[in-house]
Amino acid sequence: MADLSIFSTHHLHPEVTEALSGIGDYRVASAPTPEAILAESSGAEVIVVRAPIPVEVIEREQGLKALVRHGAGLDMIPVDAATQAGVLVANVPGVNALTVAEHVIWTALALLKRYPEVNTDLRERGWAAGRAHSDFGRELSRRTIGIVGMGN
């Protein structure tokens, strides 16, 4: 079996890059723009998607076999055009669920403690200005927090 022609819209983790290079001719877009993707993805059989894919890529690439979203959503892939062309569309749902959950907790704490304002004042006006915020931050103790999830 001949090597696959694999194109990625972005640089990926070194271990992933090594694995993909081991199974095919692996190329990366010079920029994650529609123009660069359209110009540089020629001949790709598999495209790893982290930037919007122009529908023209699907229309042009007769040998395109798969568009694989490096993430949970499919919003960057013109799914209808891919389906019509017989191109497999895949993603990795739930892959970042823990990271998103941690980010929600961090953001809630940052807002409770007024982190954005404190950080700005510390950087722009020094310790005394940042210290003044200590009277306005709230404690998490004895509070109820509700988190509503949408998805995995």
Label each region the model flagged:
Residues 68, 144-146:
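Residue in the alpha/beta-hydrolase core beta-strand immediately N-terminal to the catalytic nucleophile
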Residues 150-151:
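Glycine-rich Rossmann-fold phosphate-binding loop(s) that bind the pyrophosphate
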Residues 85, 93-144:
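Phosphate-binding beta-alpha-beta segment of Rossmann-like dinucleotide-binding domains, i.e.
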Residues 1-90:
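An N-terminal-biased, well-structured beta-alpha scaffold segment characteristic
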